[in-house]
Regions:
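PAPS-dependent sulfotransferases, especially Golgi type II membrane carbohydrate sulfotransferases
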Residues: 1-87, 92, 215, 233, ...
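Glycine-rich, histidine-containing beta strand-loop boundary motifs that form or position
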Residues: 92, 101, 113-115, 202-204
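A conserved segment at the C-terminal end of the G1
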Residues: 97-109
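A generic secondary-structure signal for well-formed alpha-helical elements
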Residues: 106-113, 270-274
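PAPS-dependent sulfation machinery
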Residues: 110-194, 321
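A short, structured active-site edge motif that brings together acidic residues
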Residues: 115-118, 204-206, 279-281
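A polyampholytic, Gly/Pro-enriched intrinsically disordered region
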Residues: 131-140, 221-226, 296-303
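PAPS-dependent sulfotransferase catalytic domain
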Residues: 162-277
Length: 326
């Protein structure tokens, strides 16, 4: 079932990508390059294949009115103050999009939405090309609101898609990043190309809710989703044990119930100053009142609950959930 879903989505995205390229070429031929702006926005926001294709961003950079579209001047000095790269790691449906959007609203941080940083790094794309593509993705993804999978991630009055001064650059592709590292662990050595520290952010949701939501969204069994969840946890443990990298664990329920303390801790862990009250209040306005408890949508096999309960005990960063009743 899952393979059929992926094949259907790929086919849909592939033909949409080809149609977009045809329209772009046509507009260029008739000397109407500005008409391509909405096409670029749709490619980045609505088509996963286009969004994760580095050539999409190269094409955008060639547009005559490129600066007017992204409203950021990426000159030779733009990256001079860059101090860190951040990458999200974890499991899908855990709150990465929310945390990525909150960070992107900070005046010194730009976060791309699912550019798939690690894939491009592995394929030999230059550090400069990846960095520029992150900026373009962030700028375009915030056009006409920052909506994704039915949720609105816009933070009113803040700096999503723009910066005062760029100090931290990152990509939100938690599950995809882990898949690449699991299959090609040597990719971690390629991060040296950026000449700044690389830090990982691991957003943690209640494992049962996370597994249930993934099973629901992908129409798979709870057992299949649980096995995938703990495969990712194994990779995260290896990254945590690698002293080359800092890993910041962010509990989604802490973000919801203690937003100021959690955001202060996260921002300062990136060696930035404590965020302003205006920023914190804007971020709090985007948070849910409580975490979604998707686990109660299912009737669980006691053997599976026992399996998950035992696996949770293997991971220090999941210790909060070790003795919590289901």
């Amino acid at each position: 079932i899952l393979a059929k879903q992926y094949l259907f989505r790929f086919t849909k995205f592939y033909f949409s990508h080809l149609i977009s390229l045809f329209k772009i070429n046509t507009n260029n031929i008739v000397n109407k390059p500005k008409k391509n702006h909405q096409i670029f926005i749709n490619m980045v926001k609505e088509n996963q294949l286009s969004r994760e294709n580095i050539n999409t961003y190269n094409l955008i950079k060639k547009n005559k009115f490129y600066n007017e579209l992204i409203k950021i001047n990426i000159d030779e000095k733009f990256f001079n103050d860059l101090e860190a790269i951040i990458l999200f790691i974890g499991y899908s449906r855990s709150g990465h999009s929310l945390v990525g959007s909150l960070l992107d609203a900070h005046p010194e941080i730009l976060i791309s939405h699912e550019l798939h940083f690690m894939k491009h790094l592995l394929s030999g794309v230059t550090a400069n090309n990846i960095a520029e593509s992150i900026v373009i993705n962030s700028a375009i993804f915030n056009k006409n609101g920052r909506e994704y999978t039915g949720y609105d991630y816009s933070i009113d009055g803040q700096y999503q898609g723009k910066v005062k001064r760029l100090r931290v650059l990152g990509d939100k592709k938690g599950n995809g990043t882990i898949r690449i590292i699991r299959k090609y662990p040597e990719v971690l050595t390629l991060l040296d190309k950026f000449n700044v520290p690389v830090k990982f952010i691991h957003v943690i949701r209640n494992p049962y809710d996370n597994i249930a939501t993934r099973a629901k969204r992908n129409n798979t069994s709870l057992r299949f989703a649980a096995k995938g969840y703990f495969k990712n946890m194994e990779v995260i443990t290896r990254i945590t044990q690698n002293t080359t990298f800092e890993v910041q664990h962010v509990l989604l329920e802490d973000l919801i119930y203690k937003p100021e303390a959690t955001l202060n801790s996260l921002i300062t862990s990136l060696d930035l100053e404590r965020p302003t009250e205006n920023y914190l209040n804007a971020c709090k306005g985007r948070l849910f009142s409580k975490p979604k408890e998707t686990r109660f949508d299912y009737s669980w096999d006691p053997m599976l609950v026992n399996f998950i309960s035992k696996k949770i005990k293997h991971y220090e960063f999941l210790k909060r959930f070790q003795h919590r009743p289901f």
